[in-house]
Amino acid sequence: MFSPLGQFKHIVCPFLRTGRKCQSRNCFFSHDFQNSTKISPPYSENVEGYPKVKIEKSLPYKYDNCKLSICVPIVTTCIPYHSVENLNFNIRQNISTTLNLEKTNDSIKETKNENFRMDVLETYKCKQLNHQTTHLPTNTVLKKRSLFNDAISIVPNKKKQLVSAISTNSDSQGASSNIIPTPKYDSNSPAGHELRKRMTHLLYESYKDLGYSNAESSMLALLDEKNICETANSKMIYSSSCKSKILSLKKAPKKNEIQGSTPDEKLESLVHSEEELILWGYNIGDVAPVNPPDELRECDRCGTRFADPRGPCTYHWGKLFREKQGGEKIRTYTCCGVKEGDSSGCIIEDNHVFKYRHLPYLASVHPFSYLPDSTNSKQLSHCALDCELCYTTNGMELARLTVVAKESIIMDVFIKPKGKILSLNTRFSGIHDAKELESGITMDQMYIKIKELGMNKNTILIGHGLENDLNAMRLIHKRVIDTALLFTHARGPPFRYSLKYLTKKYLGTTIQTSTHDSEEDAVSALQLVFYKTKSNESQN
């Protein structure tokens, strides 16, 4: 296989070195054990037959508060048993060490002295060499470890000192300069790393504006960004969730204002900004009434366009839910479990129904109005409300209003609709008898009652999906706490969690077991807001 060039004749045969007989007929190595050249291993000058390892010049090493990487050459040739006792474990002179370090700030480089770095380096060298001895036979390992005891004992517990020095130095550095936090790189994140760094920077600046220190702002920004990154599953959702969080921080109270604040002041910190309300579809401006140009309406249940509301109307009242069946993703209805397209509906009603979504059309049925600036009697600082609606010839109209303050009902009335009732929408409104609506109060009488309660422009209105309730009441109000916005969905706008889900998750209670109840929904929304204020207190 090889030509007889004698390239290995100066190396003693491995079998002879270990005291065994060479079985090879034409061995490439030298069998002249006495006259062969004595080659020293890297640890000693008196070990026979050991190949010499090239000693590389150690590169200048530096220390910082980043990762510490130590590369030590590992000898693959087994050391003869009789040579272990003659080994000289001089770590500094005989082992080539390379420290691959990242860039660091000049302040950290100047503060670290040479002696401390050498001690830290010696600790890692000793540990690395101690790890290599596991490749030797058992009795050799014991002998070699005994030689390490003195070397290791002179540098006790330097790793803990290193970690302590890094944390102390980073704290002092964060207090003295603005260091923008950088999120940890993740190849599986929904957004690119540059976008993540930009959003983390904006979150960091938002916390800085609230009076938090550099270290606190950095920690909170990284924590918020990490939570959003873990819950989002696309770049668009990640971006919208970050923007929503930044908007909420803009109207949050200063750090020094949180301590010792009253319950009303704590609620004040949760009031949504106008930008956030517009993002989620709230109306905060005047609305001019416009009559619908087309008499044809689209059924809100079956999608049929009609001029005469008389049915029949066949539809599915449940929502479409995507699930896997037989390895295939299909959409089924939650009401009956039927696959999409297999049935036109599982419920048959006598009339088609519709609702206006365009605000000018809503204003043509009843105009929008504002709450008064102040009331002559009592002032209502905050309250929770919930509305129930029914279908009429004018679309969806307000049927019931419930107002709750301090978890007790202060107003619960039925509202008489202007149009003819087509459907009570009992499954979602909880109203079973149309006579209750016929004997109810009008919209104008409702405005008088809520003013008598003390509602004004400064009152904080609390609810879930409150933009629909305000549109049903034809109210324009900017001081709102919406639990759908307070507990934002992981996918961002326009997705939102249901009140039933939030109540079960955060309060541990189950609501809406049969039909919707406006009193139950209003109390649940108020309890969720109180839960949020307590949660914010524990975080601060």
UniProtKB/Swiss-Prot annotation:
Enzyme class: hydrolase
Its EC number(s): 3.1.-.-
Swiss-Prot/TrEMBL GO biological process terms: exonucleolytic trimming to generate mature 3'-end of 5.8S rRNA from tricistronic rRNA transcript (SSU-rRNA, 5.8S rRNA, LSU-rRNA); rRNA 3'-end processing; U5 snRNA 3'-end processing
PANTHER family in alphabetical order: FI18136P1-RELATED (PTHR12801:SF115), RNA EXONUCLEASE REXO1 / RECO3 FAMILY MEMBER-RELATED (PTHR12801)
MF-aspect GO terms: 3'-5'-RNA exonuclease activity; exonuclease activity; nucleic acid binding; zinc ion binding
Protein family according to the UniProt entry: Belongs to the REXO1/REXO3 family.
C3H1-type ZnF: 7-34
Source organism superkingdom: Eukaryota
The protein, known as: RNA exonuclease 3
Domain Exonuclease span(s) in chain numbering: 382-529
Keywords: Cytoplasm, Exonuclease, Hydrolase, Metal-binding, Nuclease, Nucleus, rRNA processing, Zinc, Zinc-finger
Localization, UniProt: Cytoplasm; Nucleus
Role summary: 3' to 5' exoribonuclease required for proper 3' end maturation of MRP RNA and of the U5L snRNA.
GO CC, alphabetical: cytoplasm; nucleus
Lineage: Eukaryota, Fungi, Dikarya, Ascomycota, Taphrinomycotina
